[in-house]
């Protein structure tokens, strides 16, 4: 079995991705009125980075980006949700492996596959794992954190479903389609 190294391109993608995640997470959110629960544009961007660079880049971008966002916003990280940002980034990357965006194609079938995958991933991460970790790590009240989790899952599904799909389509459209160049 050959050891796979992490490329410089992936490391740079993680760094830039985490920085953009922080900026979007701090300054491009829409409050919902429910405590600590916002419409987050950062997860749509995380889906793009993860789909392009893979599960490891998604994992690290989510972990590092969310941790820095929390430290710069609140002074400390809320680790249960930081962990889930890493998990969701990894899952977006895993979904993205089948999309093959670099081919220049993001068909209706690919959009449906991506959105079914992200819906399942968001429900698992935000409605199940994050609240459970909140209870185990921080001894938070179950009714509060599961309500936050379900609201976050729904909002992230909508955000990633709309903004993420647009970003993936735009990225795929910017790629040169295989066989589209012809020699005269």
From Swiss-Prot:
Pfam families: ECF-ribofla_trS. InterPro entries: ECF_substrate-spec-like, UPF0397. The chain crosses the membrane at residues 11-31, 44-64, 77-97, 111-131, 148-168. Keywords: Cell membrane, Membrane, Transmembrane, Transmembrane helix. The keyword Transmembrane applies. It is a multi-pass membrane protein. It comes from the Bacteria. It is found in: Cell membrane. The keyword Membrane applies. One of its GO terms (cellular component) is plasma membrane. Belongs to the UPF0397 family. This is UPF0397 protein SAB2561c.
């Amino acid at each position: 079995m050959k050891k796979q190294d992490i490329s410089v391109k992936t490391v740079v993608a993680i760094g830039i991705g985490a920085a953009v995640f922080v900026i979007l997470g701090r300054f491009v959110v829409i409050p919902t009125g429910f405590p600590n629960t916002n419409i987050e544009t950062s997860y749509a961007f995380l889906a793009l980075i993860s789909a392009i660079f893979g599960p490891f880049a998604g994992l690290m971008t989510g972990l590092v980006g969310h941790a820095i966002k929390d430290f710069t916003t609140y002074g400390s990280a809320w680790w249960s949700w930081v962990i889930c940002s890493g998990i969701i980034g990894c899952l977006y990357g895993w979904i993205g492996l089948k999309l093959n965006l670099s081919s220049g194609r993001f068909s209706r079938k690919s959009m449906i596959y991506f959105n079914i995958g992200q819906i399942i991933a968001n429900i698992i991460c935000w409605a199940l794992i994050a609240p459970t970790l909140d209870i185990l790590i921080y001894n938070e009240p179950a009714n509060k954190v599961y309500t936050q989790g379900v609201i976050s899952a729904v909002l992230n599904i909508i955000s990633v479903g709309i903004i993420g799909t647009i970003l993936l389509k735009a990225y795929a459209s910017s790629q040169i389609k295989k066989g589209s160049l012809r020699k005269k």
